[in-house]
C-alpha cells in the first residue's frame, strides 16, 4: 500500500514538470512580442493577437499537466 502511494506522489510530481515548460513557453512568447514590437512598432496590432494565441496554447498545455497531476493524486 505504501509503495502505491509513493508511486502516486512520484507520478504527480513528474506530471507537474510540464508546468515549468509552459512557463518558459509563455515567457518566450512575450519576449518575441517585445522584440517584434521594438523592431517595428507599427506591427503591434498584428503581433499582439498572435502573442495572445501563443500564450493561450502554452497555458493550455500547462493546465493539462496540472489536470493530469490532480487526476493522479485524487482519482487513481
Swiss-Prot record:
InterPro entries for this protein: ATP_synth_F0_csu, ATP_synth_F0_csu_DDCD_BS, ATP_synth_F0_csu_sf, ATPase_proteolipid_c-like_dom, F/V-ATP_Csub_sf
TM helices/strands, residue ranges: 14-34, 52-72
Tagged with keyword Plastid: no
CDD domains hit by this protein: ATP-synt_Fo_c_ATP5G3 (cd18182)
Keyword line: CF(0), Hydrogen ion transport, Ion transport, Lipid-binding, Membrane, Mitochondrion, Transmembrane, Transmembrane helix, Transport
UniProt-annotated site: Reversibly protonated during proton transport, residues: 59
GO molecular function terms listed in the Swiss-Prot or TrEMBL record: ATP hydrolysis activity; identical protein binding; lipid binding; proton-transporting ATP synthase activity, rotational mechanism
Pfam families in the cross-refs: ATP-synt_C (PF00137)
Superkingdom, taxonomy of origin: Eukaryota
Location(s), subcellular: Mitochondrion membrane
Membrane topology (UniProt): Multi-pass membrane protein
A single GO cellular-component term on record: mitochondrial inner membrane
Gene Ontology BP term (one): proton motive force-driven ATP synthesis
PROSITE patterns: ATPASE_C
Family from the record: Belongs to the ATPase C chain family.
Oligomer status and interactors: F-type ATPases have 2 components, CF(1) - the catalytic core - and CF(0) - the membrane proton channel. CF(1) has five subunits: alpha(3), beta(3), gamma(1), delta(1), epsilon(1). CF(0) has three main subunits: a, b and c.
Stated role: Mitochondrial membrane ATP synthase (F(1)F(0) ATP synthase or Complex V) produces ATP from ADP in the presence of a proton gradient across the membrane which is generated by electron transport complexes of the respiratory chain. F-type ATPases consist of two structural domains, F(1) - containing the extramembraneous catalytic core and F(0) - containing the membrane proton channel, linked together by a central stalk and a peripheral stalk. During catalysis, ATP synthesis in the catalytic domain of F(1) is coupled via a rotary mechanism of the central stalk subunits to proton translocation.
Protein name: ATP synthase subunit 9, mitochondrial
Annotated organism of origin: Candida albicans (strain SC5314 / ATCC MYA-2876) (Yeast)
Gene coding for it: ATP9
Amino acid at each position: 500500500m505504501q509503495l502505491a502511494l509513493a508511486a502516486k506522489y512520484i507520478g504527480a510530481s513528474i506530471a507537474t514538470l510540464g508546468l515549468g515548460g509552459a512557463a518558459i513557453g509563455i515567457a518566450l512568447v512575450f519576449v518575441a512580442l517585445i522584440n517584434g514590437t521594438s523592431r517595428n512598432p507599427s506591427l503591434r496590432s498584428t503581433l499582439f493577437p498572435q502573442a495572445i494565441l501563443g500564450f493561450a496554447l502554452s497555458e493550455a498545455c500547462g493546465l493539462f499537466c496540472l489536470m493530469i497531476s490532480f487526476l493522479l493524486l485524487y482519482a487513481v
